[in-house]
Each structure stands twice: as C-alpha cells, then as structure tokens.
Amino acid sequence: MAIYIVKEGQLQMTGSETNIDLNSLNLDSSPWLKSSDIELYDWSSHTFYLNTNKEKGKYSGRHFVVASGDERLFLGVFFPIYMSSFPQIPSIMAMDDFITPNDIIQFGQLGHKFTGEINKTDNFKQALDSSGILHNGIEVELVNLKKKNNTTVDYTFKVTNLDTETLYLLDPDKMGNSRFHYVTNGVNFVQNDTYYFPENIQHTSFETVPESWYIKLRPGQNMVRTVGLSGFSNLPEGTVKCWFSFPGSIIKAGEWKKRDGRIWMGNYFVEKEIELR
C-alpha cells in the first residue's frame, strides 16, 4: 500500500476530477507514503495511523494516487482549506498539524459521506486487508432523542469497539458536556423541511486531552451515554431525521499509540430517523 504524488502539469484542481485513466498519469518515482510508514488503517474513520510524520501542507492543490503494488486504486487531491467548493474525489486536508497531527492521515468527509465515496471502494478495502493493516474501528448508533423542554434535548448514543485492540474514546461523562460540545455540535434534525439546530452552543474550549477524559473499550465492549444539549427554538415532536457526529480526540504527533491500544481518531457520522418525545 502506497500513495504517490502526481507530477505537476497533468491535472487541474477542480475538485471533481473523474473518469481519469490512472495508468496514463506520470507519478513521482518514490512514494510519498510507503507501506513501511503505515501502522494501520481504520475503516470506520478512513484514517491512516503512521509510525512517522508526513508533511501535507506543501502539497496543497496537488493530486495523488493510492496504489497497491502495481495496481493504481484511485485518484485523490490534497485539498486547500481556503477552497469554497468541495472535492468530489477522495481528499486529504492540505494542512500540517491542523485537526490531525502529521502522523495521522485522514480522508475528508462531507457529513456522513466521504469525498469520492471512498467507503464504497471494495478493491481498496481488499488491498488493505491483504496488507494486514485493515482495522474495523468503531460503530456508533443514535439510540434515543428526548425533548426536555422547548429548547433542550437529551440524546443517547452507543459506541461499540469493532476492532481487535483496545480503543481510547472521548467520554462525555468524564470530560463534561460543555467540553464534549467543543469537538462536536451534538445533534441537529429536520422535520417537514424545517431544520432545528442549537444556536450558541455552550462549550468549553481546550487544547489537550488528559488521560482521565478517555474511556478504554476492549474489543466488543461498548459505552452508552446520554448528553444534554440546549439552544434550540420551538422544538417539535414526532419523527425527525437526526444527525450526530461522534468526535475523535485532539492529540499531537506521537500520542496516538498507547501501551495497551490506541486513541481513536476521526469523526463517525450518524444519520437516522428517530422519534423526538
């Protein structure tokens, strides 16, 4: 498994480069990311965990090809954060130590969809599995949505460790709701074309995550948490389409690996029709 930079002058960055003959592209002779750099790939967040640091910012606007051996799997782009449009092909944010450290490479997503629908690329998943680096990560389910009053809801979610190793996950019961809502906007939903989302979410900012804010889930274990969220206006009742994003942690390079497992990184987006009562 490797990622090669496409030599300049062959492609324009439009964000929607499709139907490209990958075998016609001239690539750098040496891979930007080689197999020995990769510790694992988490399928639930489409994230490479590395044993080295990789610069991303200097490749802003450049294209890359993900390959397995001699097979070129798909085209992607280092997407500049200043672009007003969104890529329609797999993307990596072209920023160093921004959102993710340089020993984490995460493919971009728009809501529950990864750009280029990388989650539907079976040949990529098979190649990861054949390389022995594929990990299943987590599964997140939105369990319950309760209306406390016209401006506040309690939402309940369940996170299950589908992986083969212990995962460190942010725990709202340990870090507090206001800190949890610094890294996620919680829930929002729609009913009859009317959208409901909290305004001025009460959150507490932070720069580092102490060990005490994590829950450690062994393989097969789960956590169920109920979190309160205020700031809505005139909440409805009945069936709504609800969205929730479970967040990964904030870490620096070299911190993801633990003696007994790893810190889960990324975002797991849930979309579900659910009763608000």
Per-region residue spans from a language model:
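A structural signal for conserved, well-ordered secondary-structure elements
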Residues: 1-139, 183, 265, 269-277
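Beta-strand-rich interaction surfaces with strong enrichment in secreted/lumenal proteins
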Residues: 38, 211-217, 230-232
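Exposed aromatic-hydrophobic patches
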Residues: 49-52, 224-229
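Short, solvent-exposed loop/turn segments enriched in Ser/Thr/Gly
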Residues: 60-61, 150-155
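Short structured motifs
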Residues: 140-143, 208-213, 226-229
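Asparagine-centered strand-capping/turn motif at beta-strand->loop junctions
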Residues: 147-149, 157-167
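The feature marks short-to-medium sequence segments in extracytoplasmic or secretory-pathway proteins
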Residues: 169-222
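Terminal connector regions
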Residues: 226-277
